[in-house]
Each structure stands twice: as C-alpha cells, then as structure tokens.
Amino acid sequence: MALKNINYLLIFYLSFSLLIYIKNSFCNKNNTRCLSNSCQNNSTCKDFSKDNDCSCSDTANNLDKDCDNMKDPCFSNPCQGSATCVNTPGERSFLCKCPPGYSGTICETTIGSCGKNSCQHGGICHQDPIYPVCICPAGYAGRFCEIDHDECASSPCQNGAVCQDGIDGYSCFCVPGYQGRHCDLEVDECASDPCKNEATCLNEIGRYTCICPHNYSGVNCELEIDECWSQPCLNGATCQDALGAYFCDCAPGFLGDHCELNTDECASQPCLHGGLCVDGENRYSCNCTGSGFTGTHCETLMPLCWSKPCHNNATCEDSVDNYTCHCWPGYTGAQCEIDLNECNSNPCQSNGECVELSSEKQYGRITGLPSSFSYHEASGYVCICQPGFTGIHCEEDVNECSSNPCQNGGTCENLPGNYTCHCPFDNLSRTFYGGRDCSDILLGCTHQQCLNNGTCIPHFQDGQHGFSCLCPSGYTGSLCEIATTLSFEGDGFLWVKSGSVTTKGSVCNIALRFQTVQPMALLLFRSNRDVFVKLELLSGYIHLSIQVNNQSKVLLFISHNTSDGEWHFVEVIFAEAVTLTLIDDSCKEKCIAKAPTPLESDQSICAFQNSFLGGLPVGMTSNGVALLNFYNMPSTPSFVGCLQDIKIDWNHITLENISSGSSLNVKAGCVRKDWCESQPCQSRGRCINLWLSYQCDCHRPYEGPNCLREYVAGRFGQDDSTGYVIFTLDESYGDTISLSMFVRTLQPSGLLLALENSTYQYIRVWLERGRLAMLTPNSPKLVVKFVLNDGNVHLISLKIKPYKIELYQSSQNLGFISASTWKIEKGDVIYIGGLPDKQETELNGGFFKGCIQDVRLNNQNLEFFPNPTNNASLNPVLVNVTQGCAGDNSCKSNPCHNGGVCHSRWDDFSCSCPALTSGKACEEVQWCGFSPCPHGAQCQPVLQGFECIANAVFNGQSGQILFRSNGNITRELTNITFGFRTRDANVIILHAEKEPEFLNISIQDSRLFFQLQSGNSFYMLSLTSLQSVNDGTWHEVTLSMTDPLSQTSRWQMEVDNETPFVTSTIATGSLNFLKDNTDIYVGDRAIDNIKGLQGCLSTIEIGGIYLSYFENVHGFINKPQEEQFLKISTNSVVTGCLQLNVCNSNPCLHGGNCEDIYSSYHCSCPLGWSGKHCELNIDECFSNPCIHGNCSDRVAAYHCTCEPGYTGVNCEVDIDNCQSHQCANGATCISHTNGYSCLCFGNFTGKFCRQSRLPSTVCGNEKTNLTCYNGGNCTEFQTELKCMCRPGFTGEWCEKDIDECASDPCVNGGLCQDLLNKFQCLCDVAFAGERCEVDLADDLISDIFTTIGSVTVALLLILLLAIVASVVTSNKRATQGTYSPSRQEKEGSRVEMWNLMPPPAMERLI
C-alpha cells in the first residue's frame, strides 16, 4: 500500500512536471511575428515556424513571404510601350529603360520636340532627330539638367567648417577661430593684446583667456582689487588703497597701523594751578574746581563777578578793582535791579490791558505773552485787547462781519468792536427779517396798511410787532395818506405863517422838490422886519440870496440846469452856516454851496414869520405892497410848475394846514401836459414846452407861431436877366455887426454882397470858380475852399468885428481877413446880387444868378418883399428880382444831342441819353460799346472816335509793318510814346525817312538809340539810354520836344520815368514830316542782324495818334476820327503779348526751367516731373523695379521696401544674415530668410553656442595650448601635448565618440545602439543574448521528448533534482536578452535616432 502510494506520488509528480514544461514550452514558442500582424493583404500567418509563413490570398501576384511586396517588381510589366523593366538588385524597385522618343518614370511621356520647360535650370534644348537634348549650364547634369552637381562631395572645407553647395561652386562657413576660403587659416585672438596689466593671454579657438597677475581681475584683467573693501582702518580713519596693499590715514588723536591706539593729550600736563586734566579723543579738558582759578588751562585768577552781583541775568564785566553790570533792555540800575515800567505811557488803545514782558509771573497765565520768559526779550509790553479789537496797540477794529453773522441775506456792517445787520426783504417768500442776526421773522407788515405805494417797514419792540410807512415822493402821513404835491399855474402863491424861532444856535430848514421848464421863477421867499431870504431860478440855476438891513449878505448858487421838466430836490439849512444843497440824478455827487451865517447879533436867523412859495402877493395887501417897496426887490416871475414834499422848519406843508385866503392859483396834485407831443412847429422849428402852453423857436427861413410861413426868396437872373437889390440903412450899427443870408446857385461866379457908402467901399463878397471870395480895401483877398455852386441851399454869414472880418458857412468858419475898424452908419448901402454900375459889377464876379433868402442884419430881417403887416423898417429897391426861387426852363433850347431826352432841373437840365452815348448833352458816342475791335485788341476811346490797342508779338520772322498818314492830321507831332520788351541787343523798332528828314528808333548794343533830323536843321540829333533795355522786361519810353511850341527844340528821352532824363545838346524840328505821306516802318531788322524784332511792342503813339496794328476790318465799324495813321502792309500781326515776364511768377514747379516766349512760357522739367508746369510726378514704380519688395514712388527716383531676407536697390540681393553673426566657439552660421541659426561645434550648445556641454581641460602655455574634451586628460609628453581620452572616446582632442556598433556586433537582425564605451543590441523577438545569438525557436516536439526523457531519468535518480531542474528550466526565458514581448507587442518596435555630432573644434594656447 505504501509502495502503491509512492507510485501514485511519482506518477503525480511526473505528470505535473510534464504539464509545467508543456506550458513553458508553449509560452516560449516563436509566434511573435503573427502577433505583430506582419502578414499583409488579407493573408494568413502560420505559427510555430522559424520565420513568418504567410498564406497569401492571391498567389498570382508573386508576393514575398509577408504577402506585402512583390518578389519581382517587374512581374506586372509596369513600363509602358516597348520599354524594358530592370529590377534593382537588393531592392524591391525597378527602372524603365525608355526607347527613343519617350521619357518619364514608366516611359509614359512622348518626346516629340523641345517643348516648354523641357530643360531645367536654364538648360538649352537642342532638337535631335529622335528626341531633344539639353545642354546644361555649369553645375548641373542629367538629361533635363535636373541634377545639381554637389561640389561639397569632396569635403573641401577644413577645420569643422560647413560646406554649402552652390551652382557650379561651393562656400565654406568657418567656425570661430578660422578663416580663409577653405577655413584652413587659424585666427590669433591674442594679436590685439587684449589683456591688461601684464596679464598672460591664452589663444583659443575663436576666443582668448586672460591669466591675471596678483591684485587684478576682470575679463581683460582691467580691474584692480580694492584692499580697502574690508574697512581695516579704525576710529574714523581713511583707508588709502594701493597696489596690493593699503594705508590708514588716522584721525587726530589716534596712532597705529590700523589707527587703533588713542593718543594721551594729558601727557604734557597742560592744566595749571593744580587743575585736573581729563583726557578725551584728540582733546583734553581742565577741571579747575577748588583751585581758585579758571580758564581753559586754569590760568586765570577767579574775577569779582564770580559772586554774580548783577541781577536779572545781566552780564558782569570785571575791571581792575571793580565790576560793571551790562543790563538787558528793560532793566536799569547799578546792578540791573530796576525793572522799567513800559506801561506808564498807556500805549494800549480801545481799553486794552497793558502787560509788561518783564512780568515773569504772568507767563503761562495770559495768552498774549510768549510761551516762556526770556531776559533777552523782556523789554517792552504787550496789549491784551478787548473783544473786537486787535493790533499791537489794539488800534485795529476786528471785522466781525468776516464770519458772515447775518442770516437770511442780511448785509453786515462792521462797527468798532461790534457789528449790525441790515435785514432784507425776501421777495420770493414775501418775508421781512429782523433781530441782531436777521434770524427773526417780522410780522408787522403781514397786513399791508401803507397807502399810495408806500413801503411798509416792520419792527419788533418791547415784545410787540409793529410797522412804519416809508412814503414815496408826494405823500406823507403815518400811512402815506396825505398828498404833498401842489400845482402852480402862474401869478399865484402859497402864504405860510410860522412862529419866530429866536434861540441862538437853533437850526431851521427849507426843503422841497420842484418840477418846471421856466428858467426864471421864484420858489420861496421868507422874511421878517430886517432879514429876508429868497430861493429862485435864474437862467435855470438855483440861487439863494439873503439880505440883512437892505444889504446883500449871502449869495449862493449851483450851476446845474434844473429847468428841464424833471424833478429836483433842493434844501436850505440855516445854522452856524447857510448850506444850499441840490440833489439830482444828473449830479454825480451832491451839489452843495455854503456860506457863513449873515447875523452877528444874538438874533436867530430862523426868526421868520412869513414864507411865500411860488410868488409874492404883489398889490394884494397893504402889508405886501409895503414889504416889496420897502426892500425895493426886483420882481422875479412867479413859479409855474409843481412843488411837493415841502418842509419848512421840518414841518410838512400841505393845503390842509394852510388857512383860507393864503393861496392863489394853487391846486392839489401836479397837472402837466406835453404841448410838443403833437409837433405844432411842423419840424420847421424847435418846440419849447412852457408848461401851460408852448412856443416855436423857428428854424431859418421859417417864421410864425407855428413856423408855417417862410421868408420870400428873391430870384436873381431869371432867364439870364441882370438884377440886384439895394437896402439903405436907417440907423447906425456900430463896428460889430452880423450879416447872413441863404444862397442857392449853380453858377461859378456872381456878386453876392457889397457894403459901402457914397465915398467908401467897405466890403465885397462874390463867387469865384464856385468858391466864396471876400475883399476889403487895403487887405488881401480871401478865397475859401468851400464850393458853393452845387445847387443846394447854403447859409452864409459875415461877422464884422474890430480889425477882423470872418466868413462862415452855417457854423463852419471858412476864414477871415484883417481889416481896419469901421462903423456902419446911417445912410450906408447894402447891395445884393449886383451893382447899378454894370462894369463895376463885372469886376466883382458879375451879376448873381440864383436865389437869396432870409437876409438878416444882426437880428433884423431885410425882406425883399415885405408884408404890409410886418411894418418893415427898410424898404428895398429891387431891380429885375422876382419872388420865389423858380428855375429857368433850360430845355427850351433843346440842348440834348443824338436823340437824348431833356429833363429840366432848377437852372439846369439833364439828358436821358440813348445807348452808347454819354456826356451832359449826349454829345459823346461810346464807340467801344459797339465792340469795334477784333479779338485780342482793346478798344481805346479817342477824340471823336476810337482805336484798337494791342501788344504785338514779333518772332523775328514776321516782317516789318508799314504805316502811313491819312493826310488829315493837323496837330503838331512833338512826341512819341511806346512800350516794348525784348532780349535783342541790336534791332530796329521804328524807322521813317523823307529826305532830308529822318527818324530812327532802335536798340544798339543793348541800349535804346534815337536819331532824328527834321525841319530846317542840318544836324542829326542822337540820344542813347543810360540803362540796358534788352532784359526781357517791359520798358515805357517817351521821346518828346522840351519846347513843343518852338519850331526847333532839344529832345529828351524818358525810359521808365527814371531820372535823370537824357536830353540832346542840339535842337531839331518836330515830327510833322510824318504827316506828309511818309512811310513808317515798325519792327524792321538791323543791318547786322538777319532777323527782325523778336519780342513785344505796344501800340505806338505819335503826337497822341495811335499806330494801330489793325486796319479797318470787314464787319467792324470803321474808325470815325479824322486824324489817323493807317496800316498799309497786309501782313497780319500776332497779338497777345503778356505785360509781364510770366516767368517772374515762377510758374514752373519743382525746379523746372521757365522760358519766356512773350505770349506764353515753356517749362523744361527736371528728371522725375512732367506736365505744362512740371506738376506731374513721373511714377518710377510703373515698371515694377522692385523684385522682392514694394515700390514707393519718389521725385525722379523710387524706393524699394524689401521683403524680409532681401536687400539691394531693387531688393535683388538675398541678405547674408551671417555677415554680422554672433555664433561663437567655432559654430557655423546658417543663414535663413529672417535671420540665422548657429550650428554648434564640439562641446558647445545654446542659441549662439556659448555654453559648454562638458568641462574641458586646458594645458600648455601662452604660445602652445591644447584643450581636451569629453573628460580627456591633457598631458605634456616629450614637449608634445596630447589628450589621454576616456574609454569610449578618441581623436586628437578626444572629440570623437567611438562607434562600438561599427563592427556590426549584433547578429540575427539585432539593432545595435552605440553607448558610452559600449554597445547594446536590440534583438528581434525570436532571439536573445548580448549579441542576439540565442535562437528561441527550436522544434517544439523534439524539445518535449528530450525534456521528458531527461526528467524521467532525473526523477528516477533523484526526485529532488528533477524538481529543481524543472523550476530552473521554467525560469530560464526570464533572464535571457533585453526584449519584453508584452511591451513590444503593445507598442511596436523601439527605434532610437542618434544624433551624429561633428568633431569639436580644437582649442590650444598660443
């Protein structure tokens, strides 16, 4: 049983071991390729084979074992036509060899001829009989020149430079430290000696390093090390830096290298007389206590002032045997013990309290004193002011209104130490305010009780609200219920009786308002037995007069017009002085006059018993008559107007308090009418309102109550008759008179006035050329500038004064003459308009024709036609003088010509002229209105006709113009006038000849030349201008006889009116020979000039007759004037010459050159501009010159704004951004479109290759050095520098990483990964091992039986060994290779791309 159990146990172990092995075998079988889905094109993968075995679904396609590629690419005959398919050995690709005439990858393109773009890169296509052939440029090859030959294939660039292939060439980009075409020249960076302060320079590749000596630092060893940086010096000493050292400058009192020792200043024992020396820092002090001495060194014997005898902080001064106290201000006494009392003079005003500054006990108690007591400031006092005052002496009143205490809009008035508020009336709320601060509402006017627009003023007194009425003018009473206005209607008065006031020093007054238009009127009269006072208007002014005992004592007046119908207030106050006051809106201030009181005795000036207002009761009572006769008073007109608010001795006067019978023509109220409102004077005079009526002050020549009548005018010279008026004076007028009259005339001459007697002519006044003239015997004649004969009415005045006679027009003084004094006597005669003696009249301007009205001698009217009711005192004698001022019928003679219509005017006529006629009588025809001249000509009116004026243009080829007189010229030809502008230096302008007479005007040697021989003269006259005239500008020329009235005369030349004129020295005749059929040539050429005049010539005038360039043109009006020069030649004349050189205005823009062609101009434009004025900017961008940029047009140029990466005028240059690159440490610069990048070399990285990858080692010296990379050890062996490389590196500088994969150590398709000094094989899924040499895919059945046999034998021998062997076998796969099937199956095969790094640059010390 036990054995059976053992057998069962053995069978169990064997079976279990077999199952484990089978499991592990299946898990390790080579089925990984099927898991990776390597079979393509819907094929099926077969497991358990060494390699893939794919069953392809389409066996006809000749696919490989993975069913993804064809074993033979030519299997499907991909080449077209008769092309031959060639299989590339070792590759699954093919190449088609095309027959002639075909091309393309599969020979699909037929080549028939050189088609478009058949040859690339500029190759030239050559037509072959079979197919075209491309002749390639240098640097390219291939059938179509499509292959760029790589010139870099031979690696021409040295020292790690980067070769850039070009077209038929190459470029080497050197790493820093090398230069030359092939980068074969090393750069010595130490050549410029960059290291300072004797430092050692190490030359490296592309850079240098400075080995600094002791005490220097910095990149170039330029910085000295500051040894004072650590602050080694003590006790305030100053550290001085030196080269490799420092020095300490000790402060006074210290010693030592670091100033650490303090000097003992007491060592010299400076203190005397037993004084104790106390040492300090750089000083000492002596303590003299108990020695009896004082001073810095205890050297001075203690003075008498030591006992402090002086009081009040006074200064004590010792002398030989005494002392003196120097007191502070405010103190006195031998020891300054007396305090002066500055308040004794009571300096503080407004009850201010005076406090002395020396009162120390008051400090801190009174706020006006300083904060603390000081003897230095104890002199003086301060004033403690009462509330409301300030200032040093309380002299300033504080403005209590500054705090705005008044409320509700009240106005604050500042008072001494106080204020008061003037409270307003609030119109919006209709509220009155009162109280000290206007804070109380006053209710007294709640129920308004004031009448007649009186103003209610509320108040609050004794707890009661009340009011008072402020009455307007004309009312009084507590409620303004009593009217005070009185109306005086003339010859009336108001008698007021009052008790006498006899107290000396009493004050009485008179006050009233009045309104009147009277200039003379009595306002008030007061009197007693010996004194009377009169207030009256004299010439509109207020007058106050006082008489005492029939003698005038006081006479006051105010020179301000009060007779203007407005209200005026006047007041008289009798006190110690008499004051007259006028209050008027037109007075800027009160009008006041004062005088001393007229009484000398104890009697009061107020002792008046009777007062009369508005007038006196003349003849009314015996008392009144006696009163007037007693004082012999001149009568003053009674007042007419209104009085109101009359107060006598402060009492209101109204009709109610006047007794019956004490007034006459006085009514209550004020009745006034504006009499002038209806304009009763008819605008012929000034209306004067007389209160009860009106009066017209008539303007001359009107008269009558309403100025309706007019003084009759006298008509002189009616229908050209001769007449005059005689006035014989019937009284004497003395030596001062005024004679005036109205005058109207259109004649320039005529006698106006003559004053004389039978033997003597006093004065004459007449018209001379329309102006007034005046003459007296033995005086010069006066002729004024004023023109009188304009047909208007003028007021002429003559004022005769002693030694002087003045002439006026209205109020304007026209002038005066000095004359002897004479008197106008009775029997003298005034003549107006003429004199009886016709011959004498003609000598004084002739008979006057016109009207004279309102003649006045002083204020007496001398009427031509007096009214019988006027009782005229002077009866005139009239000769051919009619009434009124009717004018003559001037149209009676039909004065208008050419169909004009006559209109009669006063002593004149006017004509309504037909079209194109003018003149007073339409006698002038406006020929130019008919447009008689051709285009380009200007019509110029001349006497009895017109001329066509134009500036002619001569171009040098147009030929001369011939003129000839028409035979009707009768005037004297004494001058020639013309204008021209030319640049010719020699040319003839005008030429005429009729032997022996000759005329020539030309330009010779740039100057104007004039020749003339005429009349009976045997000499030829020549004149040459002083200035050149061929400057192209206009010149105006006048050639004239200096004496045109003589048969022969010198001639003068005027050019542009510039003085001096050129005058001939000989005389010759006029130009009259041109009137006799003489040919006149204009614009001829000079003898030595093949061309004629080239320029402009204006129309020439000879004696005022034009040489017109236009003959009588068909269709135009022929010139009607008799005197003409005719154009004989038929050649047309070009007109339109410009008056000025148009080029002066600079019409050519942008620097264009202007050429004056006389009738216009021509602009020669600079580069970049075109157009008539060179105003058009030529667009240089039109041709698109910018290849890689945007074009901006400029003047005669363009500017290209290049795209990034391009430059050049036309953006044609590709920018080499590496020219100024910053690539360091031998890096290669790679240029891009917008910049560059650095290809780092060796052990460097970063944007500019300035950071090291691994530390480097430098050995050698300043001349020869070597840098080892990648941790190499630099050693010097037998004077040769070598790098001992770490395992895995090689090269001269250890710059090369040894490629351990170069020998292909990995088998069975394993991928070799190069590592540092080793390699790693990435095995295929079916292999393992360090080199993938272990095959994991043996036959599964063979493995099973071999394993079972081995296990059986082992179990039979040692059961335990079999179990161990089974466990070891099961774990075998887990320790072999580097492959993880699960990861590879999930993520696919791992591929690592290793950067191939160029060798680093060699660095060495030079």
Swiss-Prot record:
Changing residue 741 to T: In LCA8; also found in patients with early-onset rod-cone retinal dystrophy. Changing residue 937 to T: In LCA8; uncertain significance. Disulfide bonds join 34-45, 39-54, 56-67, 74-85, 79-96, 98-107, 114-125, 119-134, 136-145, 152-163, 157-172, 174-183, 190-201, 195-210, 212-221, 228-239, 233-248, 250-259, 266-277, 271-286, 288-298, 305-316, 310-325, 327-336, 343-354, 348-383, 385-394, 401-412, 406-421, 423-438, 445-456, 450-469, 471-480, 642-670, 676-687, 681-696, 698-707, 851-885, 891-902, 896-911, 913-922, 928-939, 933-948, 1096-1137, 1143-1154, 1148-1163, 1165-1174, 1181-1191, 1186-1200, 1202-1211, 1218-1229, 1223-1238, 1240-1249, 1259-1274, 1268-1283, 1285-1294, 1301-1312, 1306-1321, 1323-1332. Changing residue 894 to S: Found in patients with retinitis pigmentosa; uncertain significance; heterozygous. One of its GO terms (cellular component) is adherens junction. InterPro entries: ConA-like_dom_sf, EGF-like_Ca-bd_dom, EGF-like_CS, EGF-like_dom, EGF-type_Asp/Asn_hydroxyl_site, EGF_Ca-bd_CS, Growth_fac_rcpt_cys_sf, Laminin_G. GO terms for biological process: blood vessel remodeling; cell-cell signaling; cellular response to light stimulus; detection of light stimulus involved in visual perception; establishment of bipolar cell polarity involved in cell morphogenesis; establishment or maintenance of cell polarity; establishment or maintenance of epithelial cell apical/basal polarity; eye photoreceptor cell development. Changing residue 310 to Y: Found in patients with early-onset retinal dystrophy; likely pathogenic. Residues 1369-1406 are cytoplasmic. PROSITE patterns: ASX_HYDROXYL, EGF_1, EGF_2, EGF_3, EGF_CA, LAM_G_DOMAIN. Changing residue 764 to C: In RP12 and LCA8. Component of a complex composed of PALS1, CRB1 and EPB41L5. Within the complex, interacts (via intracellular domain) with PALS1 and EPB41L5 (via FERM domain). Forms a complex with MPP4 and PALS1. Interacts with MPDZ/MUPP1 and MPP4. This is Protein crumbs homolog 1.
